[in-house]
Each structure stands twice: as structure tokens, then as C-alpha cells.
Amino acid sequence: MAKKKKINVPSGLIHVSCSPNNTIVSATDPSGNVLCWASSGTVGFKGFRKKTPYSAGVAADKVAKTVKEMGMGSVKMYLKGTGRGKDTTIRSFANAGITITEINEKTPIPHNGCKPPKRPR
């Protein structure tokens, strides 16, 4: 097996997508190339437990650990969606010792566009 080349990136972007059923965290370099990613499902949670803030924190911890090994010290975070895991992912990166320089909220908000789906009973 060939050795994996060590990547050294001093700063990057973290994209967090929080849907009502799952949380996906991906890390990119400043030009947008994905370096690593994790979701509540890939970390080992299935079904109802994927929705929890704890599972989002575990996924964020996994990405934070990988990013720290790549030498990334500061990140800009882009949050998207209305799921429960947003605050937990921010805390996970802060507790991992990574400096968060900017937090952007890019949740799509319709200006009276399509009709939303019916609420579950």
C-alpha cells in the first residue's frame, strides 16, 4: 500500500449542513477542495440517534481531530439548515483548540416560494 501524502493547510473552511434527520460536517481548503468529512451516520449512529446534538458533536470531533493533524489552526465556519447540531459543532471545534475566525449562517430562507411539506402527525 502506498503511503498517504501529508497535507499541510494552515487555514480552511468548515461547512456544516444540519438537516432535521442528520448533520454533515466537511472541511475544505480555502479554494474549496474537500479534505475530510463526517456525518452522524458515518460516525456510527443510525435511525433516531442521528438527529441528536450529541451525534453532531461526535462527527465534528472526528473532523476537528483530522483537521488538527493537517496543521489547520484557524477556520471559517459556514452553517446551513435548521437541525439541532449547529451549536454543538461550534463548541466541538472550539474545544479542539481550533480558532474560529468567522461564523456565517447560510440557511436558505424562501421569500414566499414553494409550499412547504405538511407537518407529520
From Swiss-Prot:
GO MF, one annotated term: rRNA binding
GO cellular component: cytosolic small ribosomal subunit
Keyword line: Ribonucleoprotein, Ribosomal protein, RNA-binding, rRNA-binding
PROSITE patterns in the record: RIBOSOMAL_S11 (PS00054)
Stretch forming the signal peptide: none
Known function: Located on the platform of the 30S subunit, it bridges several disparate RNA helices of the 16S rRNA. Forms part of the Shine-Dalgarno cleft in the 70S ribosome.
Protein family according to the UniProt entry: Belongs to the universal ribosomal protein uS11 family.
Protein name (record): Small ribosomal subunit protein uS11
Lineage: Bacteria, Bacillati, Mycoplasmatota, Mycoplasmoidales, Mycoplasmoidaceae
Gene this chain is encoded by: rpsK
